[in-house]
């Protein structure tokens, strides 16, 4: 086996072949790098301007299709990467599978992936040519008001980091943003995190959106304490990542609520102690005499979960009497398309949010991350609980993960065997089969799918 000093790395291959220009601020790649990559998109030597590649593009009101694009010269903080793998997020299935969903501009589909840096703009400082990187769902500039207050998932420079199109489809400008259903990714460095690992790309890709979200809800925003009870609604890729985060943090009981049978089985495999089918607990009625109090319902699922979390004693002077779990994680959301597996009691996802609030104990924590609820849908909360209660609620689509801080930690957990993303990345598709990958995600016949463009 070759020693580390003699082993050829991506960075060594690319930087050896590069020609430094602009005081070393950008790297231009030569043909020898192309030969080393074996099958990468056509590579030029002029700061990538004019380079051609294929991508899955959404334009006008039609369905996305694989198109040939041309790279514009890199500017500012732009980073160009050869894509290794990208995860198909469920939130994109309507854009990909339903004709007539409008878009204001031509865009590369997807948000986040794994790749290797092949060129950088003149102002890039945090990554180099040859780096293996994660392109994250959220930007993290590290300088704005929100980033400085440890809420990089709400970075204020996210939209500004990609101000214009980065490539062209004939005479049509195309915006790349963080789209990774493409042979190349082009985005700003605020979205890019170098990682130093040889783990399979398909597994790392699960961290770019869903995995990082689930782990964030149990490990960062409202971290689970050792020996606590956790209830997780939903066993998709977000929920199953949350299961593993709760296990890593030392939860004693991890209860997963999920209507799909095979996902309940996977939840047990990944660390859940109990699984519950919500379709077996559909009884819900307002408590007699409750009047207009919003949260006075008798819900059979909520009662069952409370019973599972019941302490061994009700003696409050002996530390007992808690009602409900310590932590609740909501990872359900609304159905965008009808699944081909078991359906839950409410396809809008609103009932789950209501049940989470009712289940939460007086001093418990609730983390929510779902999207896709019908416009105008409401969750009812009593005024007294809202104004004078002690429940804690942590919302956010990123689950609280700081991508540039936490991605490397999650990779380390994968390397040590504490975090299993292989089970979640259940099926892999080439770029030409991207629509089929999204269809499988929409059908929910597998936990998650991955596209490997190159």
Predicted segment positions?
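C-terminal hydrophobic helical "lid"/dimerization subdomain
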Residues: 2-51, 315-316, 322-323, 354, ...
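C-terminal segment of N-terminal export signals and the immediately downstream linker at the start
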Residues: 28-68, 77, 82, 292
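Residue-level marker of beta-strand positions
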Residues: 54, 112-114, 132, 146, ...
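Short Gly/Pro-enriched turn/cap motifs at secondary-structure boundaries
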Residues: 70-71, 104-110, 173-177, 184
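Glycine-rich beta-strand-centered segment in the early N-terminal region that forms part
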Residues: 72-87, 98-148, 153, 194-199
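NAD(P)H dinucleotide-binding glycine-rich loop of Rossmann-like/cofactor-binding domains
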Residues: 143-233
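Mid-domain Rossmann-like dinucleotide-binding core that forms the NAD(H)/NADP(H) cofactor-binding site
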Residues: 196-292
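Glycine-rich cofactor phosphate-binding loops and adjacent beta1-alpha1 units
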Residues: 222-226, 249, 270-391
């Amino acid at each position: 086996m070759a020693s580390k000093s003699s082993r050829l790395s991506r960075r060594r291959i690319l930087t050896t072949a590069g020609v430094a220009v602009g005081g070393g601020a950008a790297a231009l790649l030569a043909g020898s790098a192309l030969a080393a990559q074996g099958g990468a998109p056509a590579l030029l030597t002029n700061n990538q301007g004019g380079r051609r590649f294929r991508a899955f593009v959404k334009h006008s009101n039609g369905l996305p299709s694989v198109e040939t694009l041309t790279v514009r010269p890199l500017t500012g903080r732009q980073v160009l990467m050869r894509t290794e793998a990208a995860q198909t997020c469920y939130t994109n299935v309507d854009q990909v599978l339903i004709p007539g969903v409008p878009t204001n501009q031509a865009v590369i589909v997807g948000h986040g992936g794994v790749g290797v840096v092949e060129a950088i703009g003149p102002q890039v400082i945090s990554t180099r040519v040859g780096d293996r990187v994660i392109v994250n769902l959220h930007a993290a500039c590290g300088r704005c008001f929100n980033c400085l207050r440890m809420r990089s998932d709400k970075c204020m420079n996210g939209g500004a980091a990609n101000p214009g199109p980065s490539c062209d489809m004939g005479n049509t400008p195309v915006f790349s943003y963080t789209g990774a259903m493409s042979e190349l990714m082009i985005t700003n460095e605020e979205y890019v995190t170098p990682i130093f690992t040889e783990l399979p790309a398909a597994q790392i890709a699960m961290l770019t959106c869903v995995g990082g979200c689930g782990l964030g809800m149990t490990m960062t925003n409202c971290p689970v304490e050792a020996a606590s009870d956790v209830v997780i609604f939903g066993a998709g890729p977000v929920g199953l990542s949350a299961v593993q985060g709760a296990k890593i943090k030392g939860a004693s009981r991890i209860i997963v609520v999920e209507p799909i049978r095979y996902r309940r089985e996977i939840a047990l495999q990944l660390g859940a102690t109990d699984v519950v089918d919500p379709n077996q607990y559909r009884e819900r009625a307002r408590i007699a005499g409750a009047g207009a109090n919003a949260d006075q319902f008798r819900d059979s699922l909520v009662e069952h979960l409370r019973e599972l979390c019941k302490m061994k004693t009700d003696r409050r002077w002996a530390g007992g009497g808690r009602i409900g779990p310590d932590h609740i994680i909501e990872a359900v959301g609304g159905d965008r398309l009808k699944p081909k597996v078991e359906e839950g009691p409410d396809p809008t996802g609103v009932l789950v949010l209501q049940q989470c609030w009712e289940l939460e104990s007086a001093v418990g924590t609730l983390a929510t991350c779902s999207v896709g609820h019908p416009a105008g849908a409401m969750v009812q909360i009593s005024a007294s609980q809202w104004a004078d209660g002690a429940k804690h609620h942590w919302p956010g689509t990123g689950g609280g993960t700081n991508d540039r801080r936490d991605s490397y930690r999650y990779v380390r957990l994968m390397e040590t065997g504490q975090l299993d993303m292989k089970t979640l990345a259940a099926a892999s598709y080439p770029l030409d089969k991207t629509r089929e990958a999204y269809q499988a995600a929409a059908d929910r016949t597998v936990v998650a799918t991955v596209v490997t463009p190159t």
